[in-house]
């Protein structure tokens, strides 16, 4: 969860979410960081407390009944997809199908390298995300999965329970052409950022074409 000035305690997220639900808000969203970037240290002089979004959302789930619990964005290259599938399905059952997962490759290569050290050398986060999305999709829809990719492998993996939500609601982040292709193939939504209204109109038209290529539509 991204640190903000008015949240001094991780449990403040629960109290804010309870109040948001009482006020009629639809959803709460959590960001995902494993490590502190250099520019953050320069700006703040210390490392902020980045809490786990999935664990925080699980706590919020126990204190709410209607709020959708969402990430924007969970960084897929940080995680082994087989283990993540289990965590997501468990959380979706705990919250009664309210989980919505925004995913991305991560904004900062520096953070990826901090987590993986020398093992990060030569790894392509976009390709890792493609494999993760394919694996998660299969694990959520197939009884048994064998997958051999460049970065991830599973063998005769039966991942149960499946999430309550079917199809599982992936929201794909990223402004790039690759991000849009992922959204068209796997997403129920696309999470871009920084576009003007005119640019966004053009991007939606491009996304519609990509969806048609996948046999899908904006409707």
What label would you give each PLM region?
Residues 1-219:
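Active-site-adjacent structural elements that line small-molecule/cofactor binding pockets in enzymes
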